[in-house]
Amino acid sequence: MQNITQSWFVQGMIKATTDAWLKGWDERNGGNLTLRLDDADIAPYHGNFHAQPRYIPLSQPMPLLANTPFIVTGSGKFFRNVQLDPAANLGVVKVDSDGAGYHILWGLTNEAVPTSELPAHFLSHCERIKATNGKDRVIMHCHATNLIALTYVLENDTAVFTRQLWEGSTECLVVFPDGVGILPWMVPGTDEIGQATAQEMQKHSLVLWPFHGVFGSGSTLDETFGLIDTAEKSAQVLVKVYSMGGMKQTISREELIALGKRFGVTPLASALAL
């Protein structure tokens, strides 16, 4: 019998959660991560599954995700501990045939349950499936330090925030030309914040929760981690720049346009217009 802990998706989750912990983005039980799988991914590991998988109903049906398996982080679990005990901190779940709930096939031992942000993740998965024709498979939420810091000092406006991040590091426009969506402050772990995040995910692969953290979407764990890492690096630069008295010079609109043309991306118009 093949051991599921050696599968590419469990090993990928171990690396992503460990890297995020080492970055300082996921203190205590902060942050959550979900990866959409295919039946073929989990088929070799049926022998590892729980004999009687627990069933948990969703707070609202999600028929687009019917019969879809995911690997998810657990509620109240520490990213720093995933590498020590994957089965206690991660779970493979599969949405039922009508999208009304899911079974926990593997992991989440001792009656653990998936992240409290699962509604936000699943709703965002639905929108990114539609926005990318199924290419995006990962939703990652973390407490990226400098991005959070900027939400206290920048106007919480998509165009303003995006333009500042583009100017903070040349690669940003290339990596997220679609800009950064921003919500008002909302109570986490609710359907309301999940719906608001998913609405922004229709247009943006990055969504900021002011004074809290960031949501990112991508096709792979590496792409999603790299997306957040790139935005966070720019935020770190900006925090330093603002603390040194602000910008004396920066990347101009004309230079941003040239950058987009060189790399074949279309920058968010509202951010470019500032």
UniProtKB/Swiss-Prot annotation:
UniProt-annotated binding residues for Zn(2+): 141, 143, 212
UniProt-listed Pfam families: Aldolase_II (PF00596)
NCBIfam families (alphabetical): PRK03634.1 (NF002963), rhamnu_1P_ald (TIGR02624)
Compartments in which it is found: Cytoplasm
Sequence similarity: Belongs to the aldolase class II family. RhaD subfamily.
Quaternary assembly: Homotetramer.
HAMAP family tied to this protein: RhaD
Active site, UniProt feature: 117
Record-linked Gene3D superfamilies: Class II aldolase/adducin N-terminal domain
Catalytic activity field: L-rhamnulose 1-phosphate = (S)-lactaldehyde + dihydroxyacetone phosphate
Enzyme class: lyase
Signal peptide positions (record): none
Protein name: Rhamnulose-1-phosphate aldolase
Function: Catalyzes the reversible cleavage of L-rhamnulose-1-phosphate to dihydroxyacetone phosphate (DHAP) and L-lactaldehyde.
Keywords carried by this UniProt record: Cytoplasm, Lyase, Metal-binding, Rhamnose metabolism, Zinc
GO terms classed as biological process: pentose catabolic process; rhamnose catabolic process
Obligatory cofactor(s): Zn(2+)
Coiled-coil segments: none
Pathway: Carbohydrate degradation; L-rhamnose degradation; glycerone phosphate from L-rhamnose: step 3/3
EC code(s) of this entry: 4.1.2.19
The keyword Metal-binding belongs to this UniProt entry's keyword annotation: yes
MF GO annotations: metal ion binding; rhamnulose-1-phosphate aldolase activity
